[in-house]
Amino acid sequence: MSVEIVPLPLRINENESFLSYDDRLNRVVFKTSSGFGVVLLDDPEANRRYYSSDKPIIDAKFSPDLKYSAIQFSDYDIEILHLENGTRYIQTCKYKSSKATILGYYWTTKENILLVTNASLELYAMGLDGSCKLVKESKIKITNCVYSFNCNFGVLFLHSGGTSIQPYFFRTNSFDKLPKFNIEGNGNGFNIKNLYVTKLHEKFFCVYGDQEYIYLYEMTLETIYKIKPIKILLSGPNSIHFVDNLIIVHSELNISIVYDLKTIQRDRERGQTNKKEPEFPISAIPMTLSTINSNNLLYLMNNATKTHSTTSTPIINSINNNNNNNNNPSSSSSPSSSNNSQSSSPTMISSYEQRQIDQHKEQQLQKPNVTLYSKNWRFICPNYIFDPDSGIWYEVTLNFEKISNFLQFDSHKTIPFLQERTLLSAKFALLSIIKTIIEFKTDTLDGIGKIYDDLNKVLFRTTNRQLTESLHKSINQPNNNNNNNNNNNNNNNNNTAQTLNSTGNLSNSISIGGMNTSTDNLTTTTTTSSSISSSPSNSFIGNSKTNVNNLSYLNYKKQQQQQMEKQQHMPNDDEDSFSLIGDGGSGGSGGSFYNTNTNTTSTTNTTTSPSGKSNSNLKLSQSLNNTPNQSPNSRSSLNNSSNNINNNNNNNNNNNNNNNNNNHVVQNRQSRSNQYILINSHDMYDFVFNPIYEKLLIESQKEKEKENDNNNNNTNNNTNNNNNNNIEELNSNEKLELDSKYLIAVVIQYIKSLSFNHCTGISDKLYNLLISLLIDNNMFSRLHQFLQYYVITDSLSIAYKLLSIGEQYPPVLQLSLDMFKRLSMPNIIIETLLERGQVIQAIRLLRSTKETNEQAYQELLTPTYPIQFLASSSNQSNDTLFFSVFKFFETNNLIIPSHPSFDKYIKLFIEKFTEKSLSPLLLDILSNLNNNSTSGGDITPKKNVGGSFLNQSLNNSSPTLRSSNSLNSSPRLQYSNN
C-alpha cells in the first residue's frame, strides 16, 4: 500500500492568490488584483467565476446554498452580497467600539453566519431583505479558532491560551457550549494549526498532532473521551491528512506514515503493542506521484484482468472449438463452452475506454518534474496539497495494491482492514487476497469459511438495513417533508434532546454494488460535564450507513441517479451521509461491476459464465455541483466580471466526455464520500472463482497438449520409457483433479456461508460454476443431492444447464423438468417431452395447464401449435397414438383445415382411419373449403374467445364428440398407456 498524489485540473495562476478551501462546498476561493473568484475543485475545465471589487479583500466565503457571499474588507465588518438580486448589506461586529477585531467568520447554516472576534461569538440570521439579525452571542476572550462543518453540524474550537480548548456546537439560530478539555503534550509548543476536526469510522474526533504523538479526542454532546495517543514512528515536524478513515502523517524526512485507529485498538486489546514503543503503522514509505488515479474504475478493471484476458482467451477458444468439432455431449458442462461468440476474458473494454487507458499510460511515462515534500507545500485538510510555486493542486489518495506486504499477509488483519475501507482499490485488493488464499491454499477450509462469514455478515446487515430503511422512507416520506419544513422555521431549545440527522447530499455510490442514503437518528442530551472518561459512549455523529439491495439492483441504481440529480439542483447544507459500496457489481459494486455508457467513467466486464451469460458491469457516475447563475447588479461594490458558469447536467457530461487528456479522472465529491465496500456473490464469481476455474481449464489443456506431444515423440522409444511417462502424466492429471475438487469444496463453503448468514440474491453464475465443476469430476450423485435438497436454487439458467446434460446423467433430466415446472415454464417441458417422443405426457401437461393456468394455456396456443404434436406422433409408427393425438386437438377445435400445415396430417388421418373417423364438424368445414375453392371464395380462420381457431364452437358439435373431451375416453389410448 502506498500514498499517492494525483494532480487535479485546477491551477492557480500567477495573478491569483489562494484564500481558502471550503470542504463543504468543495470550492476554492482565490483573490486577484481586481477582486476574487471561486472555482469548483472537481471541475475538469476549472471554470472560474470572478467578482470584481474596488477594495482590498481579506477573505471571502459562500453560503451552503450558494445564495450569499460574505466578503471581509476590514478587521471590523463584512459585506454580505445576495448573489441572485445583487443587494448587499454591511455587518459590523457588535463590540467594534471596544476595539474587537474579527478573527474569522463562518456560515454555520444556509441562513446563519458566525462572527468570531477576539472578544465574543456573534451568530446572525439572514433576513429576507438581506439584512442580518443578531440571534445569539457569547462574550469570551479568544486568541485563535478552528471551525469545521462535519455531518450536518458545525463545531468551533476556541483557543484562549495554554492548551485549553473550548468547543461549541452550532445548529440553526443557536449554539451550545460543549465540555472543555485540555490538549496533552508540550504546552509551550502548542500550535492551533495542528488541530484538526475529522470523522473516523463514523465517530467525530478532535485530532492534535505534535512532533512525537497524535492525540485523539472522541466528541459527543455529553462529554469528551480521551483516546490513548499514537506515538509517531518518526518524530519531528509533520503534517496530517485523513483519507479513507486513515491517518496519514507526512514527516519532514520525506516519509508518509499511515495509521489505522481500529487496527491499533485491536492490537492493544490483544496486547501486541508496547507502551514505550511507537505504534505499528500500516505503511511507512515515501509518497509517489501518479498521473493515474489508482481508484479509477477503468484503471482497476484493466489491471485486474489484463494478464488473465491475454492468456486465457485463445486457449479457452481452442477448447470450445475442440468440443464443437468433436460433438462431445459433455461440452455443455464447461462454462466457457456455453457461448462461443463471447470472450472468456472477464473484461471487454470498448475502443473509447481503451483510448482512455492508453492516454493514461502515455501520461504515466511523461510525469512532470515535481519536488515531493516541498517546504512550500500547503497541506489542506482533509486530503489536498497546494503547491504555491507551480499553482498545482494535488489530491492525496491511497493505492491498496500489495497491501499484504505491509501486514505480513495475515488474513485476520488484512481482510478486516480492507473491509473498513471505502476506496475502489481496496475492494480489488480484498478480492485479490481472497483469490490468492484459495489459489495457493494458504489457509484451511475452516479458515476460508471464517473469511466468508465475515464478508457475508456485513452483506446481510447492510442488505437487511436497506430493506428496512426503504420501507420506512416510503411510509414516512410525506410526514418527514412536513416535519423538516417546520423544523427549519423553529428554534431548538438548549435543554431539549438534539436529533442529529446523518444523511446528506454529498453521497454517491460505486457498486463493484451498492447505495441509497439512509437516516439513523441519534438522540442525545447536552450536559455541562467536563470530565474526560476512558471509554466512549454515544457517538457525536451517530450511525449512518447506506446499503445495497441485491434483489433489485437495477431499480436501485435508477433511484440513486434520480436522487443525485435532485441533490445537484437542490443543495442542502443540513445533510451528510455515510453510505456503503455494494452490489455491485458493482458493485457489487458492490457490488458487482456494471454497464458503461458514454456519460460515465466505467468499463464493461463481460465474462463467459457456465450458462453462457455475461457478467454484470459496474457503473461509476460523475457529476458536478451547481454554481450560482445570478450575478450582482452594478450598485454593489462587488461586480460580476465573468459569464455565468453553465453547470447543468448535460454540459457536465459533455465536459467529462470531451476531456480525455486530463491527467486526473476526477470523481465528484459525492463519489468520494464514505462508502464501505461490500463483497457479494457476483464479485466472488467474477474476480475469484471464475478466474481460478479458467486457470484450471488452461492447465488441463496444456496437459493434453503435452500428452499428445509425448505420444508423438515416444513412438520409437522402448516400453519402459513409455510406462514412466504414463506414470508421470497420471500423477499430473491426479494433481489437477485434486485442485478441481478443492475448488468445489471452496465454492460449496461459500454457498454454505451465504445460506447460514441469510444472504439473498445469490448469483446464478455461482451455481453454474458449481455444476460445471461437479460434471468435470463426474460427481453426478453429489449434483443430484444438491438439486434434490435445494442447495442449488431454481433459475432458468440452471434449468437449461441441467437440461443440456440430460444425456450424460439421465436422472438430472427429470430434476430439470421439475425445476421448469416450479418456474411456470410449461412450454419448455412440452418441447422437451416432444423431442423425446413422449407425446402422451406432453398432452397431459397441456391439458393440466389449461385447467390450472388458463392464461399460460392461451399463451401457448398458436395456429400451428398442434403441428409439433402431430409430427411427433406420426413419426413413431403408432397408429393408436396418432389417432389419439389427432382426436384430442380435433375435440378442442385446434385442427385448422384452412391452414396448409394441417393438410399433410388430415390426409394421413383419412388414409389410416377413413373420413368416417372425422368429426361431423370437421367434415363440414372440409366440404365448405372444397366448395369455396371451386367457387373462388376464401375462408380465413379466426380465433374465438375460447381459444379455438374455428368460427364454430364446440357447443355446435355432436354429443358424441362432446363426450370425448378426455384422452382417457379412448380405449386404445388407455391400452397404449399401459
Swiss-Prot record:
Pfam families: RMC1_C (PF07035), RMC1_N (PF21029). Its main location: membrane. Residues 311-351, 479-495, 516-539, 592-663, 710-727 have a biased composition (Low complexity). Belongs to the RMC1 family. Residues 496-515 have a biased composition (Polar residues). PANTHER family: COLON CANCER-ASSOCIATED PROTEIN MIC1, REGULATOR OF MON1-CCZ1 COMPLEX. Residues 311-363, 474-546, 558-665, 703-727, 955-978 are annotated as: Disordered. GO terms for biological process: autophagy; regulation of autophagy. It is found in: Lysosome membrane; Late endosome membrane. InterPro entries: RMC1, RMC1_C, RMC1_N, WD40_repeat_dom_sf. Residues 582-591 have a biased composition (Gly residues). One of its GO terms (cellular component) is lysosomal membrane. This is Regulator of MON1-CCZ1 complex homolog. Residues 735-908 form the Mic1 domain. Keywords: Autophagy, Endosome, Lysosome, Membrane. May have a role in autophagy. It comes from Dictyostelium discoideum.
